[in-house]
Curated annotation (Swiss-Prot):
GO terms for biological process: protein urmylation; tRNA thio-modification; tRNA wobble position uridine thiolation; tRNA wobble uridine modification. It comes from Saccharomyces cerevisiae (strain ATCC 204508 / S288c). Pathway: tRNA modification; 5-methoxycarbonylmethyl-2-thiouridine-tRNA biosynthesis. The keyword Cytoplasm applies. Plays a central role in 2-thiolation of mcm(5)S(2)U at tRNA wobble positions of tRNA(Lys), tRNA(Glu) and tRNA(Gln). Directly binds tRNAs and probably acts by catalyzing adenylation of tRNAs, an intermediate required for 2-thiolation. It is unclear whether it acts as a sulfurtransferase that transfers sulfur from thiocarboxylated URM1 onto the uridine of tRNAs at wobble position. Prior mcm(5) tRNA modification by the elongator complex is required for 2-thiolation. May also be involved in protein urmylation. May also be involved in protein urmylation and in invasive and pseudohyphal growth. Belongs to the TtcA family. CTU1/NCS6/ATPBD3 subfamily. GO terms for molecular function: nucleotidyltransferase activity; tRNA binding. One of its GO terms (cellular component) is cytosol. It is found in: Cytoplasm; Mitochondrion. InterPro entries: CTU1-like_ATP-bd, CTU1_C, Ncs6/Tuc1/Ctu1, Rossmann-like_a/b/a_fold, TilS/TtcA_N, tRNA_thiolation_TtcA_Ctu1, UPF0021_CS. This is Cytoplasmic tRNA 2-thiolation protein 1. The lineage of its organism: Eukaryota, Fungi, Dikarya, Ascomycota, Saccharomycotina. The keyword Flavoprotein does not apply.
C-alpha cells in the first residue's frame, strides 16, 4: 500500500502556466499584455523594451545631434515626467551627447498649475537638470484664470493652446535653445488626427502626424519621441519606475473638444487595441494623398510667410493668432469694465477709450 505525504502549501513550488510567462525572458510571470502587439511581458522586460523602443525611435528619426541643447516641455504630468526621466536615462546609456533643460510654462491656473510646477521642481532635483519657468502673465500680461473670466470656459483650450505653444518657443529662444521636445504620445496624436478629420481639416494632418516639425524661417524645431508610445504604457512605466508626477486633470479640460475625441478613442480601443496606431497611420496616408510628402517620417517644415507686425512672432498672416486673441481679450475686458460701471460719466469715458483702442 503506497503512502502519499500531504502537500506543504508553504514550501510547494508555484507552477506558472507557460501562457503566463513573459514572452521575452521565459522565466518571470507576465504582468502586462501590450495593446499594440498583444505581447505578454514581465515588469523588468516591459521597462527594458519600452526604453529600447524610445531609443530606436530617436535613432531612426535622427532626433538629436551631438552637442545639441534640448528643452523638455515639462508640465509635471505623466508624459513630460517620463520624457524627462527617459531622455536623462537614454542620454547617459547611449551617449547622445545632448544637454537637457526643463522648460515649464506657468499658465496661471490657481489650484492646478501651481501644484504641478511643484512637481516639476522636485523632478529638477531628482534628475539633476536645470529648470526655467516662463509665465503667461510675464509674456502676455494675462493669466488663464483671467482669460476664462473674460472669454468663458468653453474657449479656454483655444487660448491656452495658442499661448502655450508660443510661450515654449519664446522661452526656448530666450535660452538660446533651438530644439523643444514634448511628451505628446500616440493617444494624443491619434486624437488630433481624429479631431482634424471631424473638422474636415485635412490640411492639418501632415503637421499633426509628423514626429518633427519646424516652421520655415524659425530657429525652433519640435519633436515627439513618444509618437508611437501608448498612454497606458507611459503610465505603467511611470508606476513601475516609481516616478514622481502630477496626475490631476486641468480645471478647464472637461469642456474641451479633445475630451469628446478622447472618449470616442477609448471606446474604439476597447474593441480594437491597435486603433491608436492605425489612426495615426491613416492620418499619415491621408496627408500623403493630400500633399505629396513624407509626413511622419522626417522633418516637416511649414511656410509661415512672414512675421507678426505686432510682436514679431512667425505667422502665416500679418497678425499672429496670439495677438489676434489678445486683441479680443483687451476689447472684452474694456467692454466688461463699461458694463460694470454704473455711473453714466464713467461709462461714457470708457466707451470712448474702447473706441480708441488700437492693437
Amino acid at each position: 500500500m503506497s503512502f502519499t505525504a500531504p502537500s506543504d502549501p508553504v514550501n510547494k513550488p508555484t507552477k506558472v502556466k507557460v501562457s503566463q510567462l513573459c514572452e521575452l525572458c521565459h522565466s518571470r510571470k507576465a504582468l502586462i499584455r501590450r495593446p499594440k502587439n498583444l505581447s505578454k511581458l514581465c515588469k523588468q522586460c516591459f521597462c527594458l523594451v519600452f526604453e529600447t523602443e524610445i531609443h530606436n525611435t530617436i535613432v531612426a528619426n535622427n532626433l538629436f545631434q551631438r552637442g545639441e541643447k534640448v528643452a523638455v516641455g515639462a508640465s509635471g504630468g505623466k508624459d513630460s515626467t517620463v520624457l524627462a526621466h527617459m531622455l536623462k536615462l537614454l542620454n547617459d546609456r547611449y551617449d547622445y551627447g545632448i544637454e537637457i533643460v526643463l522648460l515649464s510654462i506657468d499658465e496661471g491656473i490657481i489650484g492646478y498649475r501651481d501644484d504641478s510646477l511643484a512637481t516639476v521642481k522636485r523632478n529638477q532635483q531628482q534628475y539633476g537638470l536645470p529648470l526655467e519657468i516662463f509665465s503667461f502673465k510675464d509674456l502676455y500680461d494675462w493669466t488663464m484664470d483671467e482669460i476664462v473670466s473674460v472669454a468663458g470656459i468653453r474657449n479656454s483650450c483655444t487660448y491656452c493652446g495658442v499661448f502655450r505653444r508660443q510661450s515654449l518657443d519664446r522661452g526656448a529662444a530666450k535660452l538660446g535653445i533651438s530644439h523643444v521636445v514634448t511628451g505628446h504620445n500616440a493617444d494624443d496624436m491619434a486624437e488630433t488626427v481624429l479631431m482634424n478629420i471631424l473638422r474636415g481639416d485635412v490640411a492639418r494632418l501632415e503637421k499633426s502626424t509628423a514626429i518633427i516639425t519646424q516652421s520655415s524661417g524659425s530657429p525652433i524645431k519640435r519633436s515627439k519621441p513618444f509618437k508611437y508610445s501608448y498612454q497606458k504604457e507611459i503610465v505603467l512605466y511611470a508606476h513601475y519606475m516609481k516616478l514622481d508626477y502630477f496626475s490631476t486633470e486641468c480645471t478647464y479640460a472637461p469642456e474641451a473638444f479633445r475630451g469628446t475625441a478622447r472618449e470616442y478613442m477609448k471606446n474604439l480601443e476597447a474593441v480594437r487595441p491597435s486603433c491608436i496606431i492605425d489612426i495615426i497611420q491613416s492620418g499619415e496616408n491621408l496627408a500623403l494623398k493630400a500633399k505629396k510628402s513624407n509626413a511622419g517620417k522626417r522633418v516637416v517644415k511649414f511656410v509661415d510667410g512672414n512675421r507678426c507686425a505686432r510682436c514679431g512672432y512667425l505667422s502665416s498672416n500679418n497678425i499672429c493668432k496670439a495677438c489676434m486673441l489678445l486683441e479680443g481679450l483687451e476689447k472684452s475686458r474694456a467692454q466688461v469694465a463699461i458694463e460694470n460701471d454704473t455711473s453714466a460719466d464713467g461709462a461714457a469715458l470708457k466707451l470712448r477709450a474702447l473706441e480708441k483702442l488700437s492693437f
